Design a protein with these regions (language model features):
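Glycine-rich nucleophile elbow surrounding the catalytic serine of serine-hydrolase chemistry
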Residues: 178-187
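Accessory cap/linker subdomain of secreted extracellular hydrolases
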Residues: 48, 112-116, 124, 190-300
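Short beta-strand/loop motif that positions the catalytic acidic residue
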Residues: 307-309
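Active-site-adjacent alpha-helix of alpha/beta-hydrolase-fold enzymes
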Residues: 317-331
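N-terminal cap/lid segment of alpha/beta-hydrolase-fold proteins
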Residues: 46-89, 478, 482-484
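C-terminal, loop-rich substrate-recognition/catalytic regions characterized by aromatic stacking residues
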Residues: 47, 348-659
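Alpha/beta-hydrolase fold nucleophile elbow
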Residues: 167-179
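Cap/lid segment of the alpha/beta-hydrolase catalytic domain
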Residues: 84-164, 515-516, 592
């Protein structure tokens, strides 16, 4: 508990600093100057000559908007200007619906949207920017009783249409923002505002249940830290007051109302199942508080969206789920970054690309500039070779057609590559024995550390350690050194045949790359609580991956000595495993710094079965390497060849019969 408390204090502090300094850091990102803009270029990450950056300054306005129920919401409007004089002709508006304060006061100065160079290119090119604090946050009145509730979403509709109705707006409205600010865009789209014409959601989630409790495993640390962060944001007098409230009377009154808000961790802790009900709001949060539950409505809106995602985000799988399920004109970029990059080099690359791509996107959809963005392949993704040696690839569909699902089976070792509980072998050869198994006494100290993809999603560091220490406390299955590069691009799926001396348990599976020095590098992960293993038809396109409904009625305990199969996907990835390196799968039953696994005494013993009948394995989407392909029936070419032979035989037989009849 002491370690978690220290970690949270560090995260809370780092987030506060980030909120203040982000604008200054992003000023290193810029588009080509007008002198460079002689030729017309529009391609991924590069844009010039299509629209003019004729505004050199901007002016902030702010006020309260009164919602249908009387709640007042604070909003900032940043209008482009030339030499300080506001442009009077109507312009498109791009706005944010934020949980993290629309503006803050630092050393007596208001920091707002105009201080971020993510927004400055848009302001310079003739877009009005706006940001509104969601109810119960910032300088807005009200209390916060849940995440992405129907009240908050209806507010978004009203704000959007108010913006469109103003004399300085030309009727074209878009939305831009990341994380919470990305999700509120999708929720706004579900209400189908007539004037909302384009979205640019950055690192947004799709399925709320999978984020909080992926396959039943409770990642409480993420929710707990976020709750403490937002509680601090809501009750400190740091949010900027609206203009006219210089004595902060209204701001202080709003903050008093915030004290009635409910912490997210208190809402979600008792909600164990996807069909759990929140009695306070009479809602089913996992079904009603997030985009997945409104897929049909979002599709009916037809609003184009550019999805911006990261391979190490906490919501990586959500990105491709949204891409497959939303039917409006769309694009997706999946880069080699986390939710909120802390490395300056990585952050500069990502934010620089966002600045360019968002301008291209809004120029096309809000201003009608035919810059060709919709003629390009809709999918851009990094193929990673280490954290920073990345190559951009494009695709027309996802999963990519070049990736072949290949089974990698678990075998007895040793490999000599790690001092784990079993040091097993990972191979494309299927087991032939009838009794293969590995036993494992659960170690509740296993952890991926305190700088994970989940930590980073709430402002923490992103820096996975050498995974060897964690590997040594779990079951591992490692290949021999690779004879050639192996590219894995897509969604790995784990199939574990397990039994336990306990009635339930959490299982964590990690895909890792072991270098020639023996250092084990984190690639991706997945998790499942054994009692949630029942498979169901998904309510949305789940990309062919196993779907666990996780209703309360679906829960099935374990019976000692009776193996069952756990099938679940890992976060997708695109990673080249270098020649001479090894592919490793590590299995543990706890991640103490990130997930809340009930500890039993004595710790249970897990048996992982790996024989010819119950062959535990992972399915890896392999590009350009030999592997045992998942049995998908006879290959199409073979089927076509057999069909051709049958047709020929029928024709020959028919001709022979006609000759016999003719002779008779």
């Amino acid at each position: 508990m002491r370690q978690k408390s220290i970690k949270k204090q560090r995260i809370l502090w780092s987030v506060r600093i980030t909120l203040v300094l982000l604008a200054g850091f992003l000023l290193t990102v810029s588009l080509p100057s007008q002198e460079q803009a002689g030729e017309r270029v529009s391609k991924f990450g590069e844009y010039r000559g299509y629209s003019e950056a004729k505004y050199d300054s901007w002016v902030r306005f702010s006020q309260y908007l009164t919602m249908r129920d009387g709640i007042k919401l604070a909003i900032d409007i940043i209008r482009p200007a030339i030499e300080g004089k506001v442009h009077e002709e109507p312009l498109p508006v791009i706005w944010q619906h934020t949980r993290y304060r629309r503006a803050v006061v630092v050393d007596g100065k208001v920091r707002n949207l105009g201080d971020s160079s993510l927004n400055q290119p848009l302001l310079k090119h003739g877009y009005i920017m706006a940001s509104a604090d969601v109810r119960g946050s910032g300088a807005s009145y009200g209390s916060w009783n849940g995440i992405f509730t129907k009240e908050e979403t209806q507010d978004a509709y009203e704000i959007n249409e108010w913006l469109a109705s103003q004399p300085w707006c030309d009727g074209n409205v878009g939305m831009l923002g990341g994380s919470y600010l990305g999700i509120t865009q999708l929720m706004a789209a579900s209400t189908k505002p007539p004037h909302l014409k384009a979205l640019f959601p950055i690192v947004a989630l799709y399925d709320m249940y999978y984020v909080a409790r992926p396959n039943g495993v409770f990642f409480d640390d993420f929710l707990r830290t976020w709750s403490e962060l937002t509680r601090q944001l809501d009750t400190e007098i740091v949010a900027a007051p609206v203009i006219g409230d210089e004595d902060e009377t209204m701001l202080k009154a709003a903050i008093e109302e915030h004290k009635q808000s409910r912490p997210l961790i208190e809402i979600f802790s008792p909600l164990k199942y996807r069909d759990s009900k929140d009695d306070v709001t009479e809602s089913y949060p996992y079904q009603e508080w997030g985009p997945a539950g409104f897929t049909d409505e979002i599709n009916e809106s037809g609003i184009p969206m550019y999805l911006w995602c990261g391979w190490f985000d906490s919501f990586t799988r959500d990105g491709f789920q949204m891409y497959r399920n939303f039917t409006a004109p769309k694009r997706i970029t999946m880069g080699a970054w986390s939710h909120s990059p802390r490395d300056p080099e990585i952050a500069k690359e990502e934010f620089g690309l966002v600045a360019v791509e968002s301008l291209r996107w809004f120029d096309y959809w809000l201003k009608g500039i035919d810059n060709g963005i919709m003629n390009e392949d809709p999918i851009f993704y990094h193929v990673m070779r280490g954290l920073k040696d990345n190559t951009w690839q494009t695709a027309k569909e996802w999963p990519i057609t070049e990736a072949v699902p290949a089974k990698y089976y678990f075998h007895e070792g040793p490999t000599g590559s790690v001092g784990s509980v079993n040091d097993g072998v990972l191979s494309t050869e299927k087991p032939t024995n009838s009794s293969g198994k590995d036993e494992y006494t659960v170690d509740y100290t296993t952890t991926t550390g305190t700088a994970t993809r989940m930590d980073n999603a709430v402002g923490g560091e992103f820096n996975y350690p050498d995974m060897t220490t964690n590997d040594e406390k779990g079951l591992t299955y490692t290949t021999t050194p690779l004879k050639e590069d192996v590219e894995i691009t897509g969604h790995p799926v784990a199939h574990l045949w397990i039994s336990s001396t306990a009635a339930d348990g959490d299982f964590f599976v990690y895909l890792e790359e072991v270098d020639t020095e023996g250092v084990s590098h984190y690639v991706t992960e997945g998790a499942m609580r054994a009692s949630h293993r029942a498979l169901h038809e998904p309510p949305y396109d789940n990309l062919g991956n196993p779907y666990h409904r996780s209703y309360e009625v679906d829960v099935m305990g374990l019976t000692p000595g009776e193996p069952v199969e756990l099938a679940f996907d890992l976060h997708p990835t695109s990673n080249i495993f270098n020649t001479g390196h090894r592919i490793r799968i590590t299995i543990t039953c706890a991640d103490k710094d990130n997930a809340l696994t009930p500890e039993l005494s004595p710790p249970p013993t897990i048996t992982l079965v790996r024989n010819r009948e119950q062959a535990s394995h992972v399915v890896l989407p392999v590009v350009g390497a030999e592997a045992e392909v998942v049995d998908q029936g006879l290959p199409l070419l073979l089927i076509a060849f057999i069909a051709l032979i049958v047709v020929i035989l029928v024709i020959v037989f028919s001709m022979a019969m006609r000759k016999r009849v003719s002779k008779k």
